[in-house]
Amino acid sequence: MYTPMHNKFQNRFQLANLTHSHSFSHSWLLAISGGQDSLCLLKFMHDLVHHHLVVVHFDHRWSCSLAALRVYYLSRYMHLAWRYFRTALPITTEQDARQYRYANLIQLLYQTHSHAICTAHTASDDLETYLDQWISLRHPEGIWRLCHLSGSQILFRPLLHLTRAQTHWFTLVHYLPIWSDVSNYQITFKRNQLRHQLIPFLKNLNPRFHTTLSARLSARILSPLIVYPWHVWSSLPIWLQYQIATQWGLTLSQIQQLIYNNKYELARSSSINRFSFCDSSRSYHFNLAL
């Protein structure tokens, strides 16, 4: 069943200039956990892209492996390729789990010559990240939904225009077999404390808190200059590149490196408010944050 949310999802691809034929001629890596957000991503991509999809699932040993089995059978049902990663030892922190996922995703991206990594981060995740950065006294820059890893390979987060409530509605409408991971309710993780304790408290103080702040974050994320491909960025006048980079908060040396050294691609690490420049000829040596 085709819904208006499919149109919004497809508009994200058009905004990011990902609707060209060459974008769909390579495989797409989909990070699928089995939760409602990731299954929405899988359903959208399966309906709109139709082929060249690779489902990637990570098992951090936080709970039983039944979620991996469910994602595996769902991939088989949709006739999609499947990749499975399981840690040798249990991972104890969110930061280690994040680094483990992205390290393997980026390595798999280069090994398979895939076009992009797609993750199922929503506006609700962006709000939690914003609060986490604010509480941790880091500059709250939010999440970039498109990051170029090399000249043609990207990290794409197409669900940032949706909230968790909207993805829940989508799973109900399409009868998607979502998996509720027990680790999402463990208060030992800071993100779960924000999700289940702080945000409900703030919404109780101000019922419009979630809507207002999410709208402000979305307005910043949807800046069209953020999603321009590298060749479009390099074609902009130098004075305009300088003005945009200054608004992003880059230092003078970073601006000079961005404008005058075209062999580097820009990767933004939103958790530490720094910019790293990655040599396209190498594989990967940089951090990416949720």
UniProtKB/Swiss-Prot annotation:
It is an enzyme of class 6 (ligase). One of its GO terms (molecular function) is tRNA(Ile)-lysidine synthase activity. One of its GO terms (biological process) is tRNA modification. ATP binds at S33, G34, G35, Q36, D37, S38. It catalyses: cytidine(34) in tRNA(Ile2) + L-lysine + ATP = lysidine(34) in tRNA(Ile2) + AMP + diphosphate + H(+). Gene3D superfamilies: HUPs. It holds the Pfam family ATP_bind_3. Its main location: plastid. Its EC number is 6.3.4.19. SUPFAM superfamilies: Adenine nucleotide alpha hydrolases-like (SSF52402). It comes from the Eukaryota. Keywords: ATP-binding, Chloroplast, Ligase, Nucleotide-binding, Plastid, tRNA processing. GO terms for cellular component: chloroplast. It is found in: Plastid, Chloroplast. Ligates lysine onto the cytidine present at position 34 of the AUA codon-specific tRNA(Ile) that contains the anticodon CAU, in an ATP-dependent manner. Cytidine is converted to lysidine, thus changing the amino acid specificity of the tRNA from methionine to isoleucine. The N-terminal region contains the highly conserved SGGXDS motif, predicted to be a P-loop motif involved in ATP binding. Belongs to the tRNA(Ile)-lysidine synthase family. This is tRNA(Ile)-lysidine synthase, chloroplastic. It comes from Cyanidioschyzon merolae (strain NIES-3377 / 10D).
